[in-house]
Amino acid sequence: MAEVDALGEFKHGVALLNNGNPDLALPCLWRAFECERLNPSYLSFLGLSIARAQREWDQAARLCEMALQINRNEAVFYLNLAEVYASSGSRAKALKTLDAGLEKFGDDDRLRGARRKVEKRRSPFIPLLSRNHFLNRKLGKWLHKVSKRKRKNKT
């Protein structure tokens, strides 16, 4: 019986969160979490709600990180943790989290979109030309590949 109530509270909390009401979502998600403290979905969305409603970045990040440690097979857990990191100003951690998600799930549109929102765009390779000019696009992609390869070799 507690599971059904927890699931109902969770679904209601997520709906409130998605509708831009983190303050109202927080008690629902908290009640779901109290029923099942190791449920990664409850942990992740409670963390996201705490971040949005209370701006308690450390607590929110810990909850989202725990969810991801328990279950790495849900793209939404990467998205929630990345949002918490980005909101707290930890852009590098957010990008690292999204990259890990993209590596695990391939070309997931939600992860790609979140990464685009978080990343800072570099200035065009040739500033005199527009960002959409074919030379800037080709050289930018080449530079990105080279820098990605260098980062991979460092680790």
Which sequence ranges carry the predicted segments?
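Intrinsically disordered, low-complexity, charge-biased linker/tail regions
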Residues: 1-11, 15-18, 69, 103, ...
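Alpha-solenoid helical repeat scaffolds
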Residues: 10-11, 41-45, 76-80, 96, ...
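Alpha-helical adaptor scaffolds
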Residues: 11-18, 27-76
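Structural signature of tandem alpha-helical TPR/SEL1-like repeats
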Residues: 19-28, 53-66, 88-100, 125-129
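Amphipathic alpha-helical segments within well-ordered protein domains
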Residues: 30, 48, 82-83, 98-102
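Short, structured secondary-structure boundary patches
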Residues: 47-48, 64, 99-101, 115-117
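Mid-chain, well-packed structural core segment of small domains
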Residues: 67-92
